[in-house]
């Protein structure tokens, strides 16, 4: 991956067909390639690695997008995946830093960065309650924890996301649900 810290050094890629040729800054070309890698990668750590690579290119891409139109595209892979992957791993400070870096690059619509920080705080709150309960009741059934914790959390959907994606818990299949344990 090239170093794009010098804004005056932006190598270009040539793309096009027989009728039109476009010169695309190499940073944008690399950004698009990383988007595909982020979206297709299944392993959390590798996906997160690609997110950090793309985060370095995000300011160039956002500037380019805003020069074309007045909006930020709805899908920005590193912005959409980076914080969530850290959340699923329980890395709250890293998730917060990732959100702040995306916000600094103007990758959010106004106030959406603040909304992401609130979502992070809500997810952390739910995760801490769920982890506490699971550690006191190892093997609790996934289907039961939703009912048990329903009155203690702001949004049941956050708990469902936590139990589905979190690497902080281990799931053992049991009948048509899972037994939940805190990961070591």
Residue spans for each PLM region:
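Short capping segments at the starts of secondary-structure elements
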Residues: 135-144
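Boundary/linker segments of alpha-helical solenoid repeat arrays
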Residues: 62-63, 104-116, 157-158
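Charged low-complexity interaction tracts in eukaryotic proteins
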Residues: 125-126, 157-184
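Amphipathic alpha-helical repeat scaffolds of TPR domains
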Residues: 15-42, 49-59, 72-85, 128
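Short helix-coil junctions and helix-kink-helix linkers
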Residues: 144-156
